[in-house]
Amino acid sequence: MPDRCVAELRERGYLVFEGFLGTDELAAAQEALWLHYPRPEEYFADPAAHAGLVTSQFSGIINGPWRSWDLNRLAFHPDLLDLAERFLGSADLRLYDAELWARYAGTVDYEQNHHRDFGNHSLVVPKRADPAPQITSMILLSDVGDEDGPTKVVPLSVGERVPYWPNTLNEGTGAYVANYLPAGAFADEELSVTGAAGTLFTYRTDTLHRGSRMTAERSARFTLSAQYDVWAPRWTGRVAWAERALDSNWRELIERATPRERSVFGFPAPGDAYWDEQTMADTQARYPRADLTPYR
């Protein structure tokens, strides 16, 4: 990733980078979406058959790992790891959550008030002297125009005047609201995150943003998100990957990942005191196709 990407993320609080995914990896990921979701033409042919995906703004979310390596690998794409490492200032990265999110127009109103994500990513609040220990990255897996419910993001220079707290729940949408900000706040300052499929949108968890209404009649939007911090803090996070380690998709993920890629899930690194003859043998039994040579 170019140096300007790190600088923009630090200074503006967000980054929009078109062409993040190559043509082949984008096509493979898009095809893998249909292992989890109906294609748009299938959904709109019979919305009632897929009603479970549109009971709320968030009902189209599926947590990783997923049924395809072509999707799973995007959560730890090498260029994403490069960006996170340089921005967070550490190679000791933790992937603390990963989600697929499908949104279909016509039933759910995806409009939100402005909010910051740290509220359910941390037990405390960002430290203003060093306010960026976490980032969220969202990869667009479909084209997103102004009618497709683009995320609206507020530059740090504008949003920093809004206090971190209170952070309240909007019972109508199930989304949070920063400091009671009304609908329409920052209408002249916010940016619509539009772009072609394959675009990367990364933002800090102290950056104000919101979801917006899908206005195209048969619009469908698909994204993959990955959230990163470093391993040191005890007060941040979203999921414990061990809770999902019996999932049928987990074994392939670990078996195909490199030691570097495994490490972002908390897998013991080569050279860790954890490894001995017994743990090597039993871990190999658990992941029979994994190359554990680097851990010997």
Regions found by a protein language model. Name each.
Residues T107-H114, L123-P126, E147-L156, V162-P166, ...:
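A short secondary-structure junction signal
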Residues R116-F118, I135, I139-D143, P155:
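Short, structured patches in soluble enzyme cores that scaffold and shape functional sites
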Residues R103, V154-R161, R221, Q227-P233:
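Short edge-strand/loop segments of extracellular domains
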Residues M1-E11, E18-R128:
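Non-heme Fe(II)-dependent double-stranded beta-helix
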Residues Y14, L95-D97, A132-M138, D148, ...:
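Extracellular structured ligand-interaction cores
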Residues L200-T202, D206-R296:
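Non-heme Fe(II)/2-oxoglutarate
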Residues R67-R73, V124, L181-L191, R210-S212:
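Active-site rim elements
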Residues P131, V144-L208:
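Double-stranded beta-helix
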